[in-house]
Amino acid sequence: MDRRIFGLENEYGVTCVFRGQRRLSPDEVARYLFRRVVSWGRSSNVFLKNGARLYLDVGSHPEYATPECDSVPDLVTHDKAGERILEGLLVEAERRLREEGIAGDIHLFKNNTDSAGNSYGCHENYLVGRHGEFSKLADVLVPFLVSRQILCGAGKVLQTPRGAVYCISQRAEHIWESVSSATTRSRPIINTRDEPHADAERFRRLHVIVGDSNMSETTMLLKLGSTDLVLRMIEAGVMLRDMTLENPIRAIREVSHDMTCQRKIKLANGREVSALDIQREYYSKAVEFVERRGGDEVAKRVLDLWGRTLLAIETDDLELVAREIDWVTKYVLIERFRHKHGLSLASPRVAELDLKYHDIHRDRGLYYRMERAGLVERVTRDLDVFEAKSRPPQTTRARLRGEFIKRAQEKRRDFTVDWVHLKLNDQAQRTVLCKDPFRSVDDRVDKLIASM
């Protein structure tokens, strides 16, 4: 597929820290956060003018689903726009708390685990063709996704009975199946529930739920871009070596607990390889593929960072990618902090630092303090992120949805939308079905908008 539709869904952790006596549950905090949303959308599940979806997920986790994007840099921009939208809700909620005499700060964390051991996710969506066997696609992808965490893990200090350890991935401990139709109960690597949000005869939506939420824009670019390249190779019929894992669930934990990425994991055919070996195999094939087929600047940037990350791990020179790869950035930050203050990895101050890295408030979050200090690389520009808060991607179906919502709100018309339907809730109940996510211009939608 030369042009692909991408989407990201991020769930956020929420807490409220008080200096006073009164405490709020996550449910109550979520109500404060979404009060403004409910006031104009009459629901805590809404679509926005930029084509995105914002809602409260299971367990009072705010979730932001990006609009459909047809390039990885666009997707990174719209994911960051989601952070800014939620930060705006946070600031408004804190103002309301102060007005009601409740002292305290609300924190939103773009991470994947809380102190109670609960996990919430970052779900990646890739549009793929309906032709071909989905099981074969999954067979090739699972070893890639299990080992991909060495490129794009968010890092985590994990407290174990044997002491604290630094893990590469936050999500690895919470994955229980390779392929399944569940998302919360068994948490598979790939979710097979067949909801394409497009023409089901032509398309299928690959739903990957194994990845960590990323603060780093460059890590996000590598996560999405490398997966896209592997999908392109599969679609083009490139012969990839059989890397089927004997036990993917055991392997994903073993990889996460091994910062050298050299520990051997068993393949179904009896061979033993490391996560580094697996990634080297996919990377070398991707380099050949792009050299043969040609690639744009995004593909070249992805391959450059992919190769440098593998080299940094292989040579134990993590500083090579300390500005670009989340788990490395955070590890270097924690190690410097520990050595400066003489702390063990199990120190509560280290746990606090670990969490602060993921705070999306730009004045409080450690990642954003590093960004302001020029200590991390970027993909986006502030202006583009700001515009993406209210402007949908202009080359996908999201443009139609965004324009419809914008006009309906301006005209104070009652409407209902989802990923494929645009409906005016008037006497005629006029509805347009938009099954092609690549289509950004549609006469039927123009007429519906003009009729308001």
From Swiss-Prot:
UniProt enzyme class: ligase
Pathway(s) the chain acts in: Protein degradation; proteasomal Pup-dependent pathway; Protein modification; protein pupylation
InterPro entries the UniProt entry points to: Pup_ligase (IPR022279), Pup_ligase/deamidase (IPR004347)
Key words of the record: ATP-binding, Ligase, Magnesium, Metal-binding, Nucleotide-binding, Ubl conjugation pathway
Entry EC no(s): 6.3.1.19
Binding residues annotated for Mg(2+), in chain numbering: E9, Y55, E63
Reaction(s) the record says it catalyses: ATP + [prokaryotic ubiquitin-like protein]-L-glutamate + [protein]-L-lysine = ADP + phosphate + N(6)-([prokaryotic ubiquitin-like protein]-gamma-L-glutamyl)-[protein]-L-lysine
Binding site for ATP: R53, T66, W419
Keyword Magnesium: yes
A GO MF label: ATP binding
Keyword presence, Transcription: no
Active-site residues per Swiss-Prot or TrEMBL entry: D57 (proton acceptor)
One of the protein's GO biological processes: modification-dependent protein catabolic process
Family matches, as PANTHER family: PUP DEAMIDASE/DEPUPYLASE, PUP--PROTEIN LIGASE
Function comment: Catalyzes the covalent attachment of the prokaryotic ubiquitin-like protein modifier Pup to the proteasomal substrate proteins, thereby targeting them for proteasomal degradation. This tagging system is termed pupylation. The ligation reaction involves the side-chain carboxylate of the C-terminal glutamate of Pup and the side-chain amino group of a substrate lysine.
Family, as annotated: Belongs to the Pup ligase/Pup deamidase family. Pup-conjugating enzyme subfamily.
Extra remark beyond the main annotation: The reaction mechanism probably proceeds via the activation of Pup by phosphorylation of its C-terminal glutamate, which is then subject to nucleophilic attack by the substrate lysine, resulting in an isopeptide bond and the release of phosphate as a good leaving group.
Protein name: Pup--protein ligase
Source organism of the structure: Frankia alni (strain DSM 45986 / CECT 9034 / ACN14a)
